[in-house]
Amino acid sequence: MINIEWRKDTLVLLDQTKLPTEIIYVHCTDWRQVAEAIKMLRVRGAPAIGVAASYGLILAAMEAGRLEAPFSEQLTSLYEFSETLKETRPTAINLAWAVDRVISLVKDQVESMSSMSEVVDLITKEAIIIHEEDVSLNRRMAEAGATLFEGQKNIRILTHCNAGALATGGLGTALGVVRKLHENGQLERVYADETRPLLQGARLTAFELHEDSIPVTLETDNMAAYAMQHGLIDAVIVGADRITTKGDVANKIGTYGVAVLAKFHNIPFYVAAPYSTFDFTLENGSDIPIEMRDDYEVTSLHGIQTAPNGIDVLNPAFDVTPHELVTAIITEEGVLKPNYEESIDKLRQIVESK
């Protein structure tokens, strides 16, 4: 199922807020529609919103080119539009990474250009490259992650939120590894946390695994401890929205709790994420900005009120798992293990040398 597709002058997105009961596509012809789709979670997952934002910049450049203004002022407008796109989801670093990558390319080559049509062409090519790269690195991550399970059979994986094909441009990060294990005949079953309050595990992870005929059992978030206590889980694999140089991991709210449970039950806790998820400007997870979302996501479910009027609500979209709880980080360049400051720095050197 295609979740992101660029068609001439239009970004087509699978509306993930409608899953699993409806398959509806949103057609974005304006960069503000892309920004809204990201903010409202019609497209979500750190890699996916990075890809979507890069395509959104094509539409932003088109709009800037329609302004009756000198080329330099059109460029200024494009840069302003790009900042608005970056602000839609503050925690997922892939979004800023993709936007900054595209805009940096424009600034590097702007001296050789004289019109916004040239800028549009440049951004279009780069956005397509970013999308294609995501597809490729998902496969490489899947292969790297599978090496952690060599010689094992009947593996039971617990995952939290959705780090699958719906969250990326390819196979998925955490679920990419799951798919590889299934392909190898090693996977027995996936246990998917429903992931309150927006149920990404129930609506998205269970949906895409079921569609692909991969055995999956849905559980509420507060059943993870039971599953571990009763020997139903062999490993945990999750995705990530931002990883610091220490190896602290920001991911969907509830991930930290799963990591604590895994540590207590001596179950390996793996994080699967591409290089673009690493934030080399931050050392500590406590410095990661955490997006706070609207109260109604907690006080209602599918439009039905489930809490008293006027109740105070705490609704962070993410939490941070300390690096001490992370067994290994799966990347497209291989598996990173503690000491993370050293292994992450080595990852950076490898990528920057290419």
Q: How would you name each of these model-derived features?
A:
Residues 40-56, 89, 94-95, 162-170, ...:
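Conserved phosphate/anionic-ligand binding catalytic regions in large, soluble enzymes, centered on
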Residues 94-156, 186-188, 192-236:
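Ligand-binding beta-strand-loop-alpha-helix segment within the catalytic cores
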Residues 2-113:
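Long amphipathic alpha-helical segments
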Residues 187, 194-354:
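Conserved phosphate- and dinucleotide-binding cores of soluble alpha/beta proteins
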Residues 172-183, 259:
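Histidine-anchored nucleotide/phosphate-binding helix
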Residues 26-42, 76, 147-151, 155-159, ...:
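Short, hydrophobic/aliphatic alpha-helical segments
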